[in-house]
Amino acid sequence: MSTSVLLLRAPAGTPDRYETAFSAAGHLCTSLPVLETALVNGDALRTLVREQGRCTYDAVIITSARACEAWGAAVDSLEDGPTQGTMQASDWTGTPFYVVGSTTATALAAVRAAHPQSPYAPSDVRGESSGTSQELARFVLHDLGDPPHPRPLLYLTGDKNRDTLPDILAAGGHQLHTVQVYETRGSSRFREDLDAVLRLPIHRDTALWWIVFFAPSSSEFTIPFLQEHFDLRGVDNRLLATRIASIGPTTTDFLRETAHLTVHAMASKPTPQHLLEAIQASDSGLHR
């Protein structure tokens, strides 16, 4: 009989560091994505792209591939949809688009490649060498020059953003018009993916499951699905025998105080090795 570890997070890289650490220690380890991103406010963005442009904004700032996807979806819709009568289309070809890194630059280049003659597709993409939002903000300040800047910058964001870039640009005299174009939410496939994990042959002889939680928000989302299969509270032997681990104190507090679950192991630091050591220590006490 074996022990299986279920990591409630998407694997990062190949190989994934958490999966590598647990597999090397003899555990059957599976990562299960919990969250997904989805585009939002598509109609509002489409209207903005159609009706605004350089006359309204000094520049556009995009710091994620998802935001690039949102702009591309708006361009696709405008170019492939019905014409807007005699209304003059806005022109974004002369508007600078500032991006973080090569991934976002490549994503915007793909929009232009798909619609090479479109007035909505970005042509002037800058800042690719910036590795972080902070570096990009300083690049924008230098590139646009000294105030005054009467027109705002259009900033496409998700629902979870740090204030670093807006704060730096505001301090430099720029006004931002922020538009949320995507959001992070619980995976629509989580139940299906969980069932698929439980059907894997490698878990057929599992005697004990360790379920590892990585954040309060994902914990809250997953618990209703997990408790259909796992004995999270240690009271129902018809379900899969389970112990609970946490990546750190914030998640532990949520699990104990809000979800009213017992946390059997907590990583002293949020690393694969510290998580593994916490689970091994708990297992040692269990088998004495």
Residue ranges and their predicted role:
Residues M1-R288:
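Conserved beta-alpha
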